[in-house]
Amino acid sequence: MPPVLRTVAELRARVSDWKAAGETVGVVPTMGALHEGHLSLARRARASCDRVIVTIFVNPRQFNNPADLEKYPRTEAQDAALLASVGVDAVFAPAPEEVYPRGFATNVSVSGVSEPLEGAHRPGHFDGVATVVAKLFGMTRADRAFFGEKDWQQLMVVQRLVADLNIPVTIEGCATVREADGLALSSRNRRLSAEGRARAPALVRAMQAAAEAMRGGRSVPEALAEARAAVLAAGFETVDYLELRTADLLLPMERLQGEGRLLAAATLDGVRLIDNIPV
């Protein structure tokens, strides 16, 4: 089993030894409740770095709903066993007070790319993400950091953060891992009922159909309206957004030109699912 480090001092001592030996360090930031998507990130890190740290921290600052924070699954022992199978070198699993000690007063906010979509529906969420990620990069002194493309907007926020603050870490986006029926892997999926789980792939199917329609000449507004209607018809309670945006800055796209990204968030069984695909 990989050692589970609880304090910044322990983590820094370990990393200092690695750096002194000239070894490269990769970090995979997670909130635990690990699944094959997370493990694919850890394997990618394992393949390209001498040392791999996986962080497990349910970050209270990125939840704007206290009930959501309370319900988030915490499965540390199971997570550590999964990470042992990948061969990670250390797990950093601090308590909230280790990351945000008494008197903590700094907030990192990335303007622009963080504001639409998730940013509009979850105020403060990306400030919480940017703040904890900036701290984790400082704590781990990582050379490379690995993030899933499933959280595309988060990936764009982190890339902007690193560029703007000259943080010396390379960000690697890794392809979304999906179930055989297309559903993107997510720690939230385990909260779906059996019926909800069967209906859940309708989200990505509607997105794929919209992408195909737009490539075939259907107008963007029409294709998106049809996709939203299809998601609701499949039994989803709400669609927060289903939009076509530029891939990098997430600006609205009125028609297909250049690299686009179709991004969606919808609620099923009271569980909020997000997904995105390239167009």
UniProtKB/Swiss-Prot annotation:
Pfam families xref list: Pantoate_ligase
Cellular component aspect of the GO annotation: cytosol
Active site positions: 38
Highest taxon above the source species: Bacteria
GO BP, sorted A to Z: pantothenate biosynthetic process
Main location: cytoplasm
Keywords for this protein: ATP-binding, Cytoplasm, Ligase, Nucleotide-binding, Pantothenate biosynthesis
InterPro entries cross-referenced by the UniProt entry: Cyt_trans-like (IPR004821), Pantoate_ligase (IPR003721), Pantoate_ligase_C (IPR042176), Rossmann-like_a/b/a_fold (IPR014729)
Protein role: Catalyzes the condensation of pantoate with beta-alanine in an ATP-dependent reaction via a pantoyl-adenylate intermediate.
NCBIfam families in the cross-refs: cyt_tran_rel, panC
Recorded family membership: Belongs to the pantothenate synthetase family.
Miscellaneous notes: The reaction proceeds by a bi uni uni bi ping pong mechanism.
HAMAP family found in the cross-reference section: PanC (MF_00158)
Name of the molecule in the record: Pantothenate synthetase
Organism whose genome encodes this protein: Cereibacter sphaeroides (strain KD131 / KCTC 12085)
